[in-house]
Every structure is written in C-alpha cells, then in structure tokens.
C-alpha cells in the first residue's frame, strides 16, 4: 500500500490512518481487520465496475503483506504474503460456494475439505 503517496489516507497533520490503527487497536483487532480486507478484495476482484481484477488482487496482496508484517513484528509465527493469500483464497473459495445456510453448510466441498479449511483457519488465528 502506498499510504505515503495516497494522501486520502492522511489527516491534516500528515498522519496516516494505518499508523493510527497500529497505535490504537490491539494485535487481534488489526489481524482481523487485515484478514477481512484481504478477503474483501479477493472476493470482489474483477467484479466491481471500473476496477480491474489486478487492481483488487494487488490490494489484497498489500493487506496480506501488512498482516504478514504485523505477525512478524510481534515475533509470532513467521508468515509470508503467499501463506496469507493461500489461506485467504481457501476462505474466498469457500464463500463462493456458500448459499446462506446457517449451521447446515452444504457446498461442493467434502466434509473433509471443510474440516481441513476450518482447522487451517484455527491454526492460522492461533499463530497470528
């Protein structure tokens, strides 16, 4: 992300919103924020009028990089941007199959695949 060059993310004192987040939110809140941003841009990539697939995918990559940096700066499990993108892509793929069911999820994924995604998510959250 080019926060320094994207002045629409700065206040009148030149302070960047992302830096504000880092000073005012907990690690868990930031990790959740970055994760949701990665997912949002992966899911919408190529769908929003006027926005290219590559532009949204690059935004997802930027947020994945922020999440990897956050994890690494906090001396937790070392993640790469690719690790996070892979994890997020699994969730985005899962979302594509979701029809809005509650507690009775049915998709083209097998129960074993869903369990593996759930386990990977839980491991990721515990480590991040």
UniProtKB/Swiss-Prot annotation:
The conditions that induce or repress this protein are given as: Expressed in the early phase of the viral replicative cycle.
Respond yes or no to whether keyword Signal is given for this record.
Answer: no
Query: What are the entry keywords?
Result: Early protein
Q: Name one Pfam family in it.
A: DUF3310
Q: Which InterPro entries match?
A: SaV-like (IPR021739)
Q: Does the keyword Hydrolase apply?
A: no
Which top-level group of life is the source organism from?
Viruses
Record-stated family: Belongs to the skunalikevirus SaV protein family.
Task of the protein = Involved in the sensitivity of the virus to the host AbiV system.
> What is the protein name stated in its UniProt record?
SaV protein
Q: Which organism is it from?
A: Lactococcus phage p2 (Lactococcus lactis bacteriophage p2)
């Amino acid at each position: 992300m080019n926060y320094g060059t994207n002045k629409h993310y700065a206040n009148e004192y030149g302070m960047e919103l992302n830096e504000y987040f880092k000073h005012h939110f907990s690690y868990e809140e930031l990790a959740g924020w970055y994760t949701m941003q990665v997912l949002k841009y992966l899911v919408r990539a190529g769908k929003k009028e006027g926005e290219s697939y590559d532009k949204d995918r690059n935004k997802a990559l930027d947020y994945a990089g922020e999440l990897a940096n956050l994890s690494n700066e906090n001396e937790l499990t070392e993640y790469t941007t690719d690790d996070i993108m892979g994890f997020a892509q699994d969730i985005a793929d899962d979302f594509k199959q979701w029809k809005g069911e509650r507690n009775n999820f049915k998709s083209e994924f097998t129960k074993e695949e869903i369990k593996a995604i759930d386990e990977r998510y839980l491991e990721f959250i515990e480590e991040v």
